[in-house]
Amino acid sequence: MKLWIHLFYSSLLACISLHSQTPVLSSRGSCDSLCNCEEKDGTMLINCEAKGIKMVSEISVPPSRPFQLSLLNNGLTMLHTNDFSGLTNAISIHLGFNNIADIEIGAFNGLGLLKQLHINHNSLEILKEDTFHGLENLEFLQADNNFITVIEPSAFSKLNRLKVLILNDNAIESLPPNIFRFVPLTHLDLRGNQLQTLPYVGFLEHIGRILDLQLEDNKWACNCDLLQLKTWLENMPPQSIIGDVVCNSPPFFKGSILSRLKKESICPTPPVYEEHEDPSGSLHLAATSSINDSRMSTKTTSILKLPTKAPGLIPYITKPSTQLPGPYCPIPCNCKVLSPSGLLIHCQERNIESLSDLRPPPQNPRKLILAGNIIHSLMKSDLVEYFTLEMLHLGNNRIEVLEEGSFMNLTRLQKLYLNGNHLTKLSKGMFLGLHNLEYLYLEYNAIKEILPGTFNPMPKLKVLYLNNNLLQVLPPHIFSGVPLTKVNLKTNQFTHLPVSNILDDLDLLTQIDLEDNPWDCSCDLVGLQQWIQKLSKNTVTDDILCTSPGHLDKKELKALNSEILCPGLVNNPSMPTQTSYLMVTTPATTTNTADTILRSLTDAVPLSVLILGLLIMFITIVFCAAGIVVLVLHRRRRYKKKQVDEQMRDNSPVHLQYSMYGHKTTHHTTERPSASLYEQHMVSPMVHVYRSPSFGPKHLEEEEERNEKEGSDAKHLQRSLLEQENHSPLTGSNMKYKTTNQSTEFLSFQDASSLYRNILEKERELQQLGITEYLRKNIAQLQPDMEAHYPGAHEELKLMETLMYSRPRKVLVEQTKNEYFELKANLHAEPDYLEVLEQQT
């Protein structure tokens, strides 16, 4: 009977156990309670971010299905052996932003299918030989932003398929030989470490297939040891992406790029050194005359090794070691000396409520880790004595208040972790004094507002993490003047994000994360779409998916057409983005018209082409303006010259005509009525003098016809003219100028100056007497003789006075040599120089 009862109970227990196990195997594991699960392309995505998970064993997954597991921002502090043995189908595991300080050997056993492992932003200090045991198929390993100082020689020896290794922002001083001998790396990131050199033998020779090598922000010593790296970099194929190696020492090379330095300047011909060590251990006292630093350091080492040889030096050598037993370390923390980085202080998860619990502060701290404590506020006086800090980790605390100026003395700080706290608002005063800060981590807070100018006190900020907050808008010019290269705005509350005055200030951007926001794919998002399309391929890390309107849910923003986002948008073919920029407005900013036009031009035409075109247009305008100015000046000069010529013609004595000797009509002169008593009797008496070859052919024909008609009467006319003029009171025998003398001058024109022979004499007489006295004297002399001999010549005298005292009429006469001879031929007496002088004055 007892036997049957025992069998019954055994079968009952077996059924109960079988019944209890069956739901576990058939259920969806942690997807029903702890985590969020989603299936995509046949792979289960298990999201367990920020669930307060302390142990990996708390996770259960569906059986026989490949999955990706995310354990971001939890409370993991250590990975124990076989922690992942039940996750054999995992192909990707994300353990970032925890406080993992140690990984036991065999922790990754059973993950033979794993291809990606993320252990970034933790507290790892060492990578041991068997740390990654069991990850034979691993292709991607991310271990950046830890405190790794040591990598053991065989740490990566079993990772025969590893292609991407990210180790930036650690404290690695050197890499062991042959560390990558069996690793087919194509991408290696070593930025932000303490490396001084990379040898060819044992390191560079094993990464010949590298495509992307990042080496910035290290402590490179540009000396002879770095020549191998320089030569190797120069021989790399042009398609490889190699970061700049910037010298940190010696001082005269600090800030210089290695590739731009000459080999002779980096490593001049090294001098020949003497041997410093003697096999017998004796000291080389003769070497003290040398001033070489390396010799002095070597000599000091030999002294320390031989205390028995110099007993008198023992007190001086041992005294410093007795005075410095070790660095001081606060009681709840662990400290480690990192040469040359300084003192590393580990105070994570020590239930520290305030930094005042660490007093007195240690000397020369470089890195202070306070992650995972219960600090609620940070006051201005808490960090006054930590001015030597280069890294401060305050992540995963309960900080709600950051007093303004709390970091005022941390002028050397380069990395600041404030992730996983309770901050709700950021202002400029919180970050005063952080002049050298390059990395700022503010993810997993409750930040709703960022005031304008918050990041201005950090002129060297490169990396900014603001993901997993509650941000909806960003103030204008929030990134202005900040050289950001990496920005994470993932998992916030952005429905749209203006490009103008916000995103367009990110001139040095290389990576931005905008996914997992409730994007409203409407007209307000057209500017963001066009900005994303202009970025390089890998700048935007993940897809930006629309949340609203409903018909665009889960649609990728970059792949949508602008007309779908904004149906009323009309694009101009020549300027495809001008209208969109004019129509898209945001509540946070107002778009300037000039800025809109300039932006539309730069969208349609490359900026370099636009600048070149504007330059050519400017040069063309300058030349046109100069040509117009020259033309105006030339025409003005010609006009002035013409006026001067006309004035000279008006004032020239050659143009004066005396009506008493007849009137002449040239080819430029208009006919006037006769103004002389003798004009009707004067018919060109000197035709042979008047002819000139400068006249036109028509004029010459008229002259020839006239000569043919009057040729026979020329002598008769000349003789009658002379006889008539002899009876004139002006040319009579009683006058000063006799007819015989004038006839001689009139007939001989060999001397061209005969017309003005007496001008100088009469001018002197005029200057002595004056115009009035001169006229009175001459008229008084002429009047009695004329009345005596020619009582009827009174009218001629009045006519002469009228001509002398009145201004002669202007005649448009061209001053030519022919007219000059013609005028001289028509004058039967010397011209009255008084009238000429009066005209000139």
Curated annotation (Swiss-Prot):
Task: Check the record and name the SMART domains matching this protein.
Answer: LRR_SD22, LRR_TYP, LRRCT
SUPFAM superfamilies in the record: L domain-like (SSF52058)
Alphabetical UniProt keywords: Cell membrane, Deafness, Hearing, Leucine-rich repeat, Membrane, Repeat, Sensory transduction, Signal, Transmembrane, Transmembrane helix, Vision
Tell me which PROSITE patterns the record gives. Answer: LRR
Residues making up the signal peptide according to the UniProt record: 1-26
Q: Which residues lie on this side of the membrane: Cytoplasmic?
A: 630-841
Localization annotation: Cell membrane
Q: Membrane spanning segments where?
A: 609-629
The cross-references to InterPro entries, in alphabetical order and at most eight, read:
Cys-rich_flank_reg_C, Leu-rich_rpt, Leu-rich_rpt_typical-subtyp, LRR_dom_sf
Membrane topology for this entry? Single-pass type I membrane protein
Gene Ontology biological-process annotations:
adult locomotory behavior; auditory behavior; auditory receptor cell morphogenesis; axonogenesis; cochlea development; innervation; lens development in camera-type eye; linear vestibuloocular reflex
GO annotation, cellular component aspect: cell surface; plasma membrane
Functional note: Regulator of neurite outgrowth required for normal hearing and vision.
Q: Which family does it belong to?
A: Belongs to the SLITRK family.
Associated condition reads:
Deafness and myopia: An autosomal recessive disorder characterized by prelingual sensorineural hearing loss associated with high myopia.
Mind telling me what this protein is named? SLIT and NTRK-like protein 6
The species is Homo sapiens
Q: Gene encoding this chain?
A: SLITRK6
